[in-house]
Amino acid sequence: MTHSPIKPEKIAATAAVALEQALVVPALFQREGIDGYKGAANDTINVKVEGVLPFRTYDWRSGQIGGPNPNGGVRKAIEFDDYAEKTVAVSFGGNIYSAVKLTDEQRDFDLGGWAKLMTKQTEAIGRGLEREAVNHLTRQDYSVTLGGAVSGRDLRRTLIRARDVLNKFRIPAEGRVLLVGTDWEVELLSDEKLNLASNVGESEAVSALREASIGRRFGFDIVVSQEVPGDAAFALHRSAFIFATGAPTVPQSVTGGTASHNGVAIRYIQDYDANYLTDRNVVNTYKGFRSVQDQLLGVNETTDQAFVSTYEHFVRGIKLDLAATDDALPLSSGTGSTPESVELAAITGVGAVGA
């Protein structure tokens, strides 16, 4: 009988594909690698964020220098702006793993090969990454929270309102997602005006993300997550959060391999404990998450000149609360307002007056 050993690289590659296809919430985030973090102090790199320049207009036929024109205008010198790029410190940290001991008897009589064990270990890592992604999603400070039980506004109009807010925040239309918990899913599927129930089960799923998708409405790909709180939903762009993974190096003293699939990396290593006649399998990945803040471009209504926001704002995502009877918007004035909320409301037109 021919002995055909399976290369560790193939095992790692299979695990990487399985892991990528098992993800739902992390799959909605923008992905990046870890090469830039290697060797960096405190596992932190400084990322330059491009600056924003305002446009300016010049008075037409404004007369001679220092002298008024017939309309009373004076020819003025043009204004020069300073261009600056901000530096943002981005930290990378975390190691999610699954380690299993496998006796000779288990390997030979119970599992019949490496495939079943690898599937289970990959599922474990997937659950860990899913939990981490949801934690970052739910702990983010959102500038806008829309109520799902606002008087006189059904769910359809709530989704339209979410679209309107992202439009006013100038978020690109392509790549928008509505991530919902299970309570939201029930309400959306039960709403005849949305007609989403007919989409469920239309096509064969090839990944957990596709399986979790229940339709597309008002520019949003609607995705369900059982990890997200049932009464919560998030309207966001896929670039709102960054999801980074990296495969640790395989030590020279053990058998192993690394692989990456669609930006999701993983390492597989194995050794044998002869004292106990036991295999030891370890599957792991480095991970990191962060949100993306933006500087905004506004226009002064008095001078009609553009300006760049003083503060950075998280505008690539908003929250929806199924039970809330009121919207929580940036306060433009009054009690509870902050310089950041006043600026955001002034630039975007999305805001409310405080008490």
Over which residues does each language-model region extend?
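Long, contiguous amphipathic alpha-helices that act as assembly "spine/axial" helices in icosahedral shell
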Residues: 47, 85-154, 169-179, 222, ...
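Extended, compositionally biased alpha-helical segments that mediate assembly or anchoring
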Residues: 2-4, 254-355
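Short, flexible loop/turn elements at secondary-structure junctions
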Residues: 51, 182-184, 285
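Short alpha-helical segments and helix-capping/turn motifs at coil-helix boundaries
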Residues: 27-34, 162-165, 265-267
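Short helix/loop capping segments that flank catalytic or ligand/cofactor-binding pockets
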Residues: 55-58, 187-190, 197, 290-292
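Extended, solvent-exposed, turn-rich assembly/linker loops in the middle of proteins
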Residues: 141-220
